[in-house]
Amino acid sequence: MSNELRLEDNYVPTSDTLVVFKQLMKLPVTVLYDLTLSWFAKFGGSFDGDIYLLTETLDLLIEKGVRRNVIVNRILYVYWPDGLNVFQLAEIDCHLMISKPEKFKWLPSKALRGDGKPYVVKLQPAKFIENLQTDLAKIYHCHVYMFKHPSLPVLITRIQLFDSNNLFLSTPNIGSINKESLYNKLDKFQGKPLISRRPYYVAFPLNSPIIFHSVDKDIYARLVLQSISRTISERETIIFKPVQKIPVKSIHNIMTLLGPSRFAESMGPWECYASANFERSPLHDYKKHQGLTGKKVMVREFDDSFLNDDENFYGKEEPEIRRLRLEKNMIKFKGSANGVMDQKYNDLKEFNEHVHNIRNGKKNEDSGEPVYISRYSSLVPIEKVGFTLKNEINSRIITIKLKFNGNDIFGGLHELCDKNLINIDKVPGWLAGENGSFSGTIMNGDFQREQVAKGGLL
């Protein structure tokens, strides 16, 4: 039965052509070009010619500067008019994850052994896909696709389940269905078109016990994680325990916060230690050391007009005092006097060159919306975090709860400090972002990370 429920890569599911069209229109032309050729080489198509002729045709279209919709229409209505198969749809979704990472949110979980010790997940991709698909296919029609992220040390798995009419996933007492009844229902609905669930993603950072997965928390999501747990439990039982409740936007951000990165435990004022900016290497030219050359007094010009204004919230301020105060704020929130603008700009530039450039090296003018970086932009923007302050006063525990929401919480607090609306000397480390995306409790000044509900996903 399980072999019958496994969907091969060439299976063409029922899909809305308009939805697929919109998805393809979000991809850069260079990606559409590469996908068309790789799909034709793998599956063939309705194009009247071989792959060499198809390559020449696409090259000619790009040289003429045709719009993106021309290539998309050819993919959907000329090369594969009967519809795209599950492999092609999976590749579209995964390329969207690469080119538009901010559209995907992730939750972290930790793999634990039976004794509670962390388990570093090490996968053999082909074997893992085979075993996972076999396990899932005991109940669902399924398709599994895995790829290595082009710029991050992480393997990302896309799992999609199908059923005839959402029968199983919508059944409230799904756990009580016995195998005989389940197989009877499978046979009954086998002839009907399959309905797909939203794809579920699981990312496996290399050499790490932490995995990242989609934010879904329904029965479907739990069953997928349980199946993955069984698949990797070869010699001992492995469970996944949630690490935090608040999702993180973008695979890049969560890899920096919780992946195998030096920044994972060095956020806020400690970022300089992760990027090795706290001191010059002994291999550098000692003649250029700041102790001999002195320190420049000039401040880099920014668009923020208030930075060059002698007047502030507390009245007139001397230029040198203002410079030192702004530098102190920058070190508090970003870990160094230079901040992270250059690093974010270089990362963004490298990302755009990797994803958005046309194959012939020319810039794609329609590559997406502009992204603005300010001096306050955090290395990893945190959008939601909460703190609970507890202090004992006169033998009573006083509790204050703080909840922050925004595009870049700690970047905003940094800006308020620059405007002198917050006294930087009164800002504790946990309010400067040193704990990353973690919420927690501050008991008598000590930060304690928020504990997620006990138990794990077996």
Swiss-Prot record:
One Gene Ontology term from the biological process aspect of the record: maintenance of meiotic sister chromatid cohesion
Subunit structure: Forms a heterodimer with IML3. CHL4-IML3 is part of a larger constitutive centromere-associated network (CCAN) (also known as central kinetochore CTF19 complex in yeast), which is composed of at least AME1, CHL4, CNN1, CTF3, CTF19, IML3, MCM16, MCM21, MCM22, MHF1, MHF2, MIF2, NKP1, NKP2, OKP1 and WIP1. Interacts with CTF3 and CTF19.
Protein name per its UniProtKB record: Inner kinetochore subunit CHL4
Superkingdom of source: Eukaryota
Alphabetical keyword list: Cell cycle, Cell division, Centromere, Chromosome, Kinetochore, Meiosis, Mitosis, Nucleus
Note: Present with 606 molecules/cell in log phase SD medium.
One CC-aspect GO term: outer kinetochore
Subcellular locations according to the entry: Nucleus; Chromosome, Centromere, Kinetochore
The species this protein was found in: Saccharomyces cerevisiae (strain ATCC 204508 / S288c) (Baker's yeast)
Family in the record: Belongs to the CENP-N/CHL4 family.
GO MF assignments: structural molecule activity
Function: Component of the kinetochore, a multiprotein complex that assembles on centromeric DNA and attaches chromosomes to spindle microtubules, mediating chromosome segregation and sister chromatid segregation during meiosis and mitosis. Component of the inner kinetochore constitutive centromere-associated network (CCAN), which serves as a structural platform for outer kinetochore assembly.
Pfam families: CENP-N
